[in-house]
């Protein structure tokens, strides 16, 4: 299909990339030794490490495929999407970090809406060990990836003078929190968008894998978003929280906790019928982002 309508895009976005976090797939005895495989199921759905959809498949014409080099020698794949209509351009670049399954190509419908409808540059970053990127994922590695992406945008001739918005979904939200907290005093992050993000992996385990709740302390991939968010001291960076109230993987209470902890200027939008993977397809989702971009 060479051209997709908005209705087509929304239908595609409702396709579940992951029925449940990998933690539910194997016994609790494997939590410690196999946790990276469970937390970062880069091969779900099948073929995700080799079959990466391209922008033209979604009618996106003004886009680049980019390779970034990390300081520790990995190559990250990414897409840069440009606004289709300069007359509605918000002069901002939205850096997107996706959830723990699939690849950056699966999220191109989101990028198309951000670029074509909202008029933003959209830099869709891939993690190490996902899609066409090299390496193996880990909390430490993804933190390096996030910093590499942010530095690339900061120094990109076309993007460096735009407002930078960092937008993360689920695991990508945890990376967003870590990245923004580490870079808050540089002064070039204009906003943060978090969707269906957990407080920490250890606190999430009892929800997705009750039989393992007593050994969650063994989890070394911690992603302590609640503790990291509480360390924000530059409180003029605005945050937008987007929460699906029917999220079957990350309890909505975790998003409320993050919202409560966040010391920055913040706004909250909830979607009564939003599940973990399809909140982005709920009515009003992109309206909330549009309003955030206009007012912040």
Model-derived features: positions:
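Catalytic histidine-centered segment of alpha/beta-hydrolase-like enzymes
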Residues: 249, 274-286
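Short alpha-helix in the alpha/beta-hydrolase fold that links the catalytic acid
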Residues: 110, 225, 251-260
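Primarily recognizes the serine-hydrolase "nucleophile elbow" in alpha/beta-hydrolase
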Residues: 152-156, 161-207
């Amino acid at each position: 299909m060479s051209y997709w309508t908005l209705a087509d895009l929304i239908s595609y976005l409702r396709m579940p990339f992951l029925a449940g976090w990998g933690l539910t797939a194997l016994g609790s005895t494997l939590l410690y030794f196999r946790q990276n495989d469970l937390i970062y199921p880069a091969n779900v759905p099948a073929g995700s490490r080799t079959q990466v959809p391209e922008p033209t498949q979604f009618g996106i014409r003004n886009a680049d495929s980019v390779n970034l080099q990390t300081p520790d020698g990995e190559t990250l794949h990414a897409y840069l999407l440009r606004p289709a209509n300069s007359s509605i351009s918000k002069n901002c670049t939205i850096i997107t970090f996706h959830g723990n399954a699939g690849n950056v190509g699966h999220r191109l419908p989101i990028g198309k809406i951000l670029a074509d409808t909202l008029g933003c540059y959209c830099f869709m970053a891939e993690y190490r060990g996902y899609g066409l990127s090299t390496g193996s994922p880990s909390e430490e590695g993804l933190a390096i990836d996030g910093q590499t992406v942010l530095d690339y945008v900061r120094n990109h001739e076309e993007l460096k003078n735009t407002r930078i918005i960092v937008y993360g979904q689920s695991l990508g939200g945890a990376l967003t929190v870590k990245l923004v907290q580490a870079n808050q005093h540089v002064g070039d992050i204009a906003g943060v968008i978090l969707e269906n993000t957990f407080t920490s992996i250890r606190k999430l385990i009892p929800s997705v894998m009750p039989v393992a709740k007593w050994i969650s302390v063994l989890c070394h991939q911690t992603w302590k978003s609640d503790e990291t968010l509480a360390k924000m001291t530059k409180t003029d960076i605005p945050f937008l929280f987007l929460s699906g109230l029917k999220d079957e993987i990350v309890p909505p209470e975790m998003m409320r906790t993050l919202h409560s902890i966040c010391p920055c200027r913040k706004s909250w939008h909830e979607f009564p019928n939003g599940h973990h993977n399809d909140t982005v397809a709920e009515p009003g989702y992109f309206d909330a982002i549009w309003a955030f971009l206009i007012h912040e």
